[in-house]
Each structure stands twice: as structure tokens, then as C-alpha cells.
Amino acid sequence: MATNAKPVYQRILLKLSGEALQGAEGFGIDASVLDRMAQEVKELVELGIQVGVVIGGGNLFRGAGLAQAGMNRVVGDHMGMLATVMNGLAMRDALHRAYVNARLMSAIPLNGVCDNYSWAEAISLLRNNRVVIFSAGTGNPFFTTDSAACLRGIEIEADVVLKATKVDGVYSADPVKNPDATLYEHITYQDVLERELKVMDLAAFTLARDHGLPIRVFNMNKPGALRRVVMGENEGTLISK
């Protein structure tokens, strides 16, 4: 596909997993990865794209393991929400150091640390070309940050949810286990459900489907991939009707 002269999206919701921030470390936040992501987001802002970001917390805290050990799931999820706030603070700082105006909002009140989530305020900031980082998931236990990404994407009327992963897109099977797995360029919501492809959890995915919110899965570790996605190039997998 020929590169478009201007971006194909006006407003996006970028979903970053917590693991994406840990780089090769295996835990925590890799400063060089954080700075690279901030630079890639900066490129989008310079193209005139309005950017909302949802970050996971898996690099700092994983509630599932502790839940198996007997910890209350609600407590574990609250800890996970706080992990996403920590990642959000790091991302906001990286963006500020890259001279990008960014605002961090949390679904749970953390006065003095970041702003409370406000739909109207978020829309206003996006229109003024501020990057808005949404943290603490949906603010409710039992909902993943993928659900938060789809929910915020729908609320801010994003053109697409861009799910940044460690793989090149959605495959017919696990490419690690099956070398013959094929990469889809485009697939419908229905096909994803029928083939039980692991794109995101069912609650998040059906929310996007019911509201006609397209999802594009791509590899954030490929330099320039995010820019190629917004310029309409064939990068990753597009999931839509």
C-alpha cells in the first residue's frame, strides 16, 4: 500500500502493555524503552494526531499469581491499578522530557499525584493536542486494562484502538509453537470469536465489537511501526466489521 501523505486517523487510543515497558529486564521499567515510546508518540502529535494512552501494569505487579496463593482478587486488582498509575507517571515524565504536553488521569482518586478521570476534560485536552494517559484501568476490579482501553476508546470517540504487543499481529495459531501460522492483515470480529483467537479478553473484545471500534494489533518493538500504522501502511492486523 502506498504511503498516504497524511495520517488516516485523527484520534487514536494506544494500548501499551506493562510488559512492553520492561524491555529485556523482565521486570520494572526500562528507561530506554520508555524514552523510545515517548519519541514515537511525539511523532504522532507532530503529525496532528490526538493521542490517548492506556498502560497495563504487568511489569510491576501480577495479581493472578497472588490470587492463586489466596489473596483476595479485589485487593490484587486494586494493587494492579496502582501499578498502572506508576507506569503512567513514568510515561508522563518521559513525554514531558521529550517536550510533549501530557496529562495523567486516574480512574481512582489520587489527589496530588494525578488528575481524576473526567470524560469532558479528556476530550478538551485531546482537542488541544495534549496526550492524555488513562491509568488505574476502569477503576473496577475484574476488568482488564484491555477493557479500559476499549472503554476509553469508545468514550473519547477514537477512530481505532492500537494494541501494541510483542508480536507482529494476529496469527492463525501461536507463531512460537507453530511455524506455519499465518499473519492476518485483516480479520472480522466474528472470525476472531469463531476461531477463538487470543486478541484480548472477551469482555474487552465484545465491547469494541458492539460499538464498532476497530482494533489494530501491531509490534511496538519494530521501530517506526506506530508511525506506519497511522499513515495507513500494512502493519499488523486490523480487526473490524
UniProtKB/Swiss-Prot annotation:
Allosterically activated by GTP. Inhibited by UTP. Its EC number is 2.7.4.22. ATP binds at K15, L16, S17, G18, G58, R62, T165, Y171, D174. GO terms for biological process: 'de novo' CTP biosynthetic process; UDP biosynthetic process. Pathway: Pyrimidine metabolism; CTP biosynthesis via de novo pathway; UDP from UMP (UMPK route): step 1/1. Residues 23-28 are annotated as: Involved in allosteric activation by GTP. One of its GO terms (cellular component) is cytosol. Keywords: Allosteric enzyme, ATP-binding, Cytoplasm, Kinase, Nucleotide-binding, Pyrimidine biosynthesis, Transferase. UMP binds at G57, D77, T138, G139, N140, P141, F142, F143, T144, T145. It holds the Pfam family AA_kinase. It is found in: Cytoplasm. It comes from the Bacteria. It catalyses: UMP + ATP = UDP + ADP. Disulfide bonds: none annotated. Belongs to the UMP kinase family. Catalyzes the reversible phosphorylation of UMP to UDP. Homohexamer. This is Uridylate kinase. It comes from Serratia proteamaculans (strain 568). The gene is pyrH.
